[in-house]
Amino acid sequence: MTKQVLIINVTRMGDLIQTGPLLSRLRDEWPDVAIDLVVDRSFAPTAALLTGLRQIISCDFTGLLDECRMQSKSLVTLMQGMTAWAAPLRAARYDRIINLTFNRQTGLLASYIGAPDLRGIIAGPDGCPIVQDPWLSYFTDLHRHRRFNRFNLVDLYAMGGSGTGAFSPLSITIPADGRAWADLFLQSQGRTVRQWIAVQAGASDVMKAWRPEYFGQTMARLSRHSGVGFVMIGTAAEADAI
């Protein structure tokens, strides 16, 4: 019988890209595995670039958190809405759930959906978050010992979500229309640029982002080299920083 895995990874665009080797590792573990991915609605286009997914399940988690903060709806109403949204996932009867979004809310979601094998943050018996799996427990303490860490985030995801296996590089699949648009855009900017550098000035949390002036200073230094051009990338929410 085909194994089913649900990955919850809702908050960061970069983390989605770094999920690629985990997808490959899961296919090594179970060649016929069906993998579903839960993401924030704003990151669904990024998730579509990953290979090996059965389906991408999106939700406006950002809007949901805003409603919680502003108390525009009662907690009971919000919980009823989320349980209704998650009902099909609960009915899917996943074999494994891997929660790579390390906060209490997604821990509650993972535990509500349920699976025989839960990894990452889940809700404990008293509702408080606990971390399942030694590799993902290590990840949650990483900020305390960064100087001593020798593991890449990609490897922690792959080891925690699956286990040991063959090396798999980061990779995404660029659709033909996206590649054609990029070629046309870059060609329209002139032929003096020999090396393009993509700059993402935003972050999932403004407190984690560089100040815009630091990006400006870095780009100014890099621009001293001839033939260098810059492309600012990001989401609509990061437009002010750009």
Features from the language model and the residues they span:
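Catalytic machinery of carbohydrate-active enzymes
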Residues: 1-242
